[in-house]
Design a protein with these regions (language model features):
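Soluble FAD-dependent oxygen oxidases
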Residues: 1-449
């Protein structure tokens, strides 16, 4: 293969030692065999990889945390995977309340590092998700009602474009790229290498909670939760998880940036429902709050494959929607399957839908569901039940979260991005007119008028 540009960084071609390990993602259900993996150590390695790929007509997939929930999005047959997971510098500026992080950092590492320094970094429900992917897709989590989405806190970025050129974006320079990078999804505009976020002073202590009920009480708990969650105090983040009938239960957990006494009072409309089997509500130092909520979620030892789908609720689920949920939960078998809800509103809804690329600001709550399996022969039926459930719930939800993608969604652009999709296509046409960065659900460039 003749080329002007040499690959740099840690380079692993198909057939090299370490290739199979490089292929592994959080979801082990991958059947793709890239030509080469480049584990970039610095921004120049990323630029060289893009130039090499262009010179050799090789398709590109960027990869940050290996946490993509769909096959085909971070790997491609015969292509180059530009993996930035070794780029892990973190630089906190306490005086200005900002932090610069390289894109290889995982969310848990950043949140824990900053908590020790007395600052809040927003996070989701898994510590092993890469900061790149979660930021570019919006970045939801239990702190969003108090300080906004992860992407709402993004001030500046560094990206390598389709020509291998390093560009920066902030409110004064390439502002359209900054706008698109705050919810427009990864793998669309270039390979990102650095992010600058505003950070917030952490409280010395905060309250965490985890309440568990038997599975057969999920309907009454959900009805109470969805009535209460959208309008509760903005400082309270709440996640509700409902496992499969076979071996599952109901768990509500989250945090309140305030006292235990006040948390108990705020939680009562839900904790008084049914007969909880376990109830933990405790005041902790903020560093321990982060550890409590970010349980280990290793990437390379996952056994279960998954199919996910997601949406944003227009209003509380009526009985018909809950009946469809029950049918799903009675038929899925994997222990990691189920429904997950996150309360909305607060700081998320105070940002206008077109102010950033993340459009779905006015929902009542966020919902996702997934099936899980080990044996590849069970994949088809598990994928089918998730997508059939989406059809049943379609009347009650809008959109879908790009970080929890579903390749069963047709004409996915408006579903992920709402009315922001046309503008995102124009940004794509400006920064990647040749559609070098693409995947089965990426944003195509707008056609020239």
């Amino acid at each position: 293969m003749k080329t002007k540009t040499r690959l740099t960084g840690r380079v692993i071609f198909k057939g090299d030692l370490g290739y199979e390990s490089a292929r592994k993602n959080w979801d082990p259900h991958t059947d793709k065999y890239p030509k080469v993996f480049v584990f970039a150590q610095r921004t120049q390695d990323v630029a060289n990889a893009i130039k090499w790929a262009r010179e050799n007509n090789v398709p590109i997939r960027p990869r940050s945390g290996r946490h993509s929930l769909e096959v085909n999005l971070s790997q491609v047959n015969g292509g180059i995977v530009i993996d930035v997971s070794n780029m892990k510098k973190i630089r906190l500026n306490k005086k200005h309340g900002t932090v610069i992080v390289e894109t290889g950092n995982r969310v848990g590492r950043i949140a824990k590092r900053l908590a020790k320094q007395g600052f809040i970094a927003p996070f989701g429900d898994s510590p092993s998700v890469g900061i790149g992917g979660i930021t570019l897709g919006g970045g939801i989590g239990p702190l969003q009602r108090s300080i906004g989405l992860i992407s709402d806190n993004l001030l500046e970025l560094e990206m390598v474009d389709a020509k291998g050129k390093v560009i920066r974006a902030n409110k004064n320079c390439n502002a359209d790229l900054l706008w698109a990078s705050r919810g427009g999804g990864g793998g669309n505009f270039g390979v990102y290498t650095k992010y600058k976020f505003k950070v917030h002073r952490a409280p010395t202590v905060a309250t965490v909670y985890r309440i568990t009920w038997p599975w057969n009480q999920f309907e009454k708990v959900l009805k109470a939760w969805q009535k209460w969650a959208p309008s509760v105090n903005d400082k309270l983040g709440s996640e509700l998880s409902i496992g499969p009938k076979k071996g599952g239960n109901v768990t509500m957990e989250g945090l309140f940036l305030g006292s235990k006494t006040e948390a108990i009072r705020l939680l009562k409309p839900v904790t008084c429902i049914g007969t909880p089997t376990k109830k933990v509500i405790k005041l902790l130092p903020y560093t321990d709050v982060v550890n409590f909520l970010l349980a280990p979620d290793p990437v390379l030892t996952q056994r279960y494959s998954n199919q996910f789908s997601s949406g944003f609720a227009r209003k509380p689920f009526p009985n018909k929607a809950i009946k469809s949920m029950r049918q799903f939960l009675e038929n899925v078998e994997g222990k990691d399957a189920g429904f997950f809800f996150l309360n909305w509103g607060g700081a998320v809804s105070r940002v206008l839908p077109r102010e950033t690329a993340f459009y779905w600001r006015k929902a009542k709550f966020y919902v996702e569901w997934n099936s899980s399996w080990i044996n590849p022969s069970e994949a088809a039926k598990n994928i089918s039940i998730v997508r059939n459930t989406r059809r049943k719930l379609q009347s009650y939800i809008v959109g879908s979260y790009i970080n929890v993608p579903d390749q069963g969604i047709k004409n996915s652009g408006p579903v992920y991005y709402g009315a922001n999709y046309p503008r995102l296509r124009r940004v794509k046409a400006k920064y990647d007119p040749g559609n070098v960065f693409n995947n089965p659900q990426s944003i195509p460039p707008a056609r020239k008028s």
